[in-house]
Structures are given as C-alpha cells and as structure tokens.
Amino acid sequence: EIHLHPMDIKLSEEGYARGEEARAWYAKSRGPVRNPEATEEELLALVQKNGPVRRIPMEGGTVFELGGRTIEVIHTPGHSLGSVCLLDRENRLLFTGDMCNDSLLLNCGDSSSTVKVYNESMRRLWAREKEFDFICLGHDALDKADKTMITDYIEATDLLLSGQAHGEKGRNALHGGTGYKYKRVLIWYEPERLV
C-alpha cells in the first residue's frame, strides 16, 4: 500500500513502471552514504522486484495513527504537486521529506510546482512552527534538523521571485540544471517557472 496525495497518483504510476531501475540507481547513488562498507553488488541485492501495489489517496488535513503516533498530513506542493509533510504533534516533529532538505528539486517539469507555489507552501509550514521543534528531512539526512532551514528556503525563494538573486547553471554529484545556493540550502529550478 502507498498512501499519497491524489495529485501524485499519476506520477507514482509512471514512476512505478520503471521502479526497479529507479531503485537500482538509488541503491548505487545513495546506498554508499548509508552503508559505506557494502559493495555495489550487496546494495543491488537489496532492490526488490515490483509487485502489486494499492494507492490510497491522502488529502491535506488527514489525521491518522502510525505506531502509536498521531500524524497530520499537510499538503505542501513543491518538489511534486502532491508533496506532503507529516506533523507529529506529540513528539514535536515535522517530517518534510523532499520539501525541505539540503538540495531541493523544483526542476522536474510539470510534476514540480513553480517557485512561487513552493514559497507559499513553506510559508504555510512556518506559520505553524510553534507546533514542532525539529524537522526530519528526506533521503540521506538521518538526524533531526534545525527547523529554521524552512526560513532559509523562504528567504531564498523570496530573493529569486523578487529578481534580487539568480541561479547558475551547474551540476553536483546527483543533480544538474539551474541552481541557487543560499545559506544551508540549494534550489534546483527552471527559471521560466518562477511564477
């Protein structure tokens, strides 16, 4: 089962068609960060074959129980149009996934939001900052992070939207395109998709 925002169902179905290939790439590119002692063959052995999957729509505002925790879904379009963050009020944690990490991708064509929509999502999260003490990022971040990373993204996108800053063409180990580095964050975006 996959619980996801309805706006990401089609994207999930398209990605699932090449899921084994994507998981193999992920194992090779990210696996060494989490398990540096493993060989590439050992990492690839962890990649599972595609099987049947049921997609369950999950809207913003949904509240559910997960392992004794009450979780609220917050719809935050950005990396994908159906991106969500998960608020664990009791433990004062906000799970941001791909919405807030050290390298944000908004350059995925029509499956990503504009910079303006992303900025609005981050402002909605920050308006609730009294409800969480830390954020839990996606991918390689295994520890809790300083929640003010959200304000870095707000400031960076404000600068891009006002024309006071511009990204540069570039590439890092995993991504490429137009990127803008600001304080602790890096935004990959499409200049023609600011607003």
Residue map of PLM features:
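Active-site environment of divalent metal-dependent phosphoester hydrolases
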Residues: I9-S12, S80-S83, N101-L104, G138-A145
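Residue-level marker for buried hydrophobic side chains located in beta-strands
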Residues: I2, L93-F95, C136
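Catalytic core of the metallo-beta-lactamase
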Residues: A38, L43-A127
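Accessory terminal helices/loops
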Residues: R123-V195
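Active-site HxH/HxHxD metal-binding segment of metal-dependent hydrolases
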Residues: E1-E65, D102, Y153-G170
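Noncatalytic linker/hinge segments flanking ATPase motor cores
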Residues: G19-K28, E40-R54, K116-Y118, D133-D143, ...
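Short, solvent-exposed loop/turn segments at secondary-structure boundaries
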Residues: Y16, L106-D110, K147-M149
